[in-house]
């Protein structure tokens, strides 16, 4: 009986957290045509894309729950600092924001000769909901061009620069 209750509680929590846009984002990756001394291996490209998309998930969860600690795995440097500041500011006024990415159009534009950074451009479509506690204040569709620079850490690529340019 305890097992059934646990499953029901976990299922309810999962359903509640995925109610706003449960669909997975469509991802399109443009072929990489980098000119330079260091070729981008397919395994590295796949890892960068996987980790960048995971960072989007962490970003959305952190802003929804107002928990900057959720950024630790996927963000470093100025990207992490700016997002943490945003979380602190919205929490201070009692708001939280839900991001649901709908589509990513990714293009890797730079891979450093030392292999210490990769820059990508992401034309992303997403939905934004701003909530005051659990009351929805606004829901908007957005399209932006993100510039991201990722650097390798011990086991994954982490986002160091995460800058949006609205369209």
Q: What function would you assign to each model-found segment?
A:
Residues 54, 101, 141-143:
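Short solvent-exposed loop/turn micro-motifs enriched in small/polar/acidic residues
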Residues 19, 113-167:
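Exposed beta-sheet edge and beta->alpha loop/turn motif
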Residues 25, 32-40, 48, 88-89, ...:
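Contiguous, function-dense segments enriched for cysteine-driven chemistry
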Residues 39-42, 68-113:
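Short solvent-exposed beta->alpha transition segments
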Residues 56, 101-103, 122, 127:
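Polar/charged side chains located within well-ordered beta-strands of beta-rich proteins
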Residues 21-77:
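Short, low-complexity N-terminal intrinsically disordered segments enriched in polar/charged residues
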Residues 1-34, 164-166:
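Amphipathic, hydrophobic N-terminal targeting peptides for secretion and organelle import
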